[in-house]
């Protein structure tokens, strides 16, 4: 669980830093789907 939280925090940082969140959002979706199954 802690690892997942850290990954989420890193993605949030990247989202804030990156002006084009499209790629980050897609990566986040992939991670979520990968986690679920």
Swiss-Prot record:
Compartments in which it is found: Secreted
Transmembrane intervals: none
This protein's record includes keyword Lyase: no
Activity under varying temperature: Thermostable. Still active after heating at 100 degrees Celsius for 20 minutes.
Main location: secreted
Coiled-coil ranges from the UniProt annotation: none
Alphabetical keyword list: Antibiotic, Antimicrobial, Fungicide, Secreted
Assigned GO CC terms: extracellular region
Biological processes, Gene Ontology terms: defense response to bacterium; defense response to fungus; killing of cells of another organism; xenobiotic metabolic process
Additional detail: Antimicrobial activity is not affected by salt concentration.
Primary role: Possesses antifungal activity against P.infestans but not F.graminearum.
Record-given protein name: Antifungal protein 4
Organism field: Malva parviflora (Little mallow)
């Amino acid at each position: 669980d802690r690892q997942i939280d850290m990954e989420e925090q890193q993605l949030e940082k990247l989202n804030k830093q990156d002006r084009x969140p499209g790629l980050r959002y897609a990566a986040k979706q992939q991670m979520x789907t990968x986690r679920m199954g």
